[in-house]
């Protein structure tokens, strides 16, 4: 259980969404259309450390990546400022 808690501590759902969106050459407006949210709402989600599973699933489908990718991808400590 302690290992799981440590892993969760290094996961940032919003940054995972942002990183994936950028890798796919998509802007927030384009993603907002796919998830049926406003661009400011997408921006807000990209800043959230924890996002509920239902919303994370919507982003995963829109970005065409597995749900677990967004849910469990750990931050690269070198890239965190």
What kind of feature is each model-predicted range?
Residues 15-34, 58:
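Short basic helix-loop element that most often maps to the first helix and adjoining turn
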Residues 75:
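Short Cys/His-rich micro-motifs in 6-15 aa windows
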Residues 78-81:
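Conserved small/polar residues in nucleotide/adenosyl-binding loops
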Residues 29, 40, 68:
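Key DNA-contact positions within bacterial/archaeal DNA-binding proteins
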Residues 48-61, 67:
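Short, basic-rich loop-to-helix N-cap that marks the start of a DNA-contacting helix
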Residues 1-23:
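A short, Lys/Arg-rich alpha-helix, primarily the initiator
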Residues 33-51, 72:
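Recognition helix of helix-turn-helix/homeodomain-like DNA-binding domains
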